[in-house]
Amino acid sequence: SYPMKLVSLDSSRFAMVWTDANTYYVKVVVGTVSGSSITFGSTVVVESYNASGYVEIDKVAANKIVITYMTWGGPGGTGLPKLSVGTISGSSISMGSAITWPYVTNGNKLEAVSYNSTEDKILVVAPGTDNATNRAKFVAAGTVSGNNITFGSLVQISTQAEEGYYFKAVYDSTTN
């Protein structure tokens, strides 16, 4: 089975994303907590083509999320990292079209996504871009506008991460 990821939207709602182990579709749903009960809106398919299983999610605003995932079938049968922006209204969610990660990743997944509300940017952590740097880690800042994301340059943040270890991104508002 594949891990589910959750993000809090407000004091009573959250979004949950996962890859369905039977269909290999990436799916998302909004949950609402009331007392000790949880109700869910309709499940929405984010990606219906051969997803790899590992997903990340973060909130961009009270009504907007970004999901990262990967599909198989890129060049040479490698993975193709993708992102999708979703807009939430109550317990409903509407997903934009898939955005292909604009940099080569050697078929590796995007490892983390985090939103910086002060700068109004998302940060995405990605693996190396070629065989020489495939264990190095990089980060790129992106601007979300509607259902689109525009990315700046990749910046290397480590040179030799061990295989099997993944980075997480968290914004700290107390530092620059």
Please describe what each predicted stretch is:
Residues S1-N176:
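Extracellular, repeat-based ectodomains that mediate carbohydrate processing or recognition
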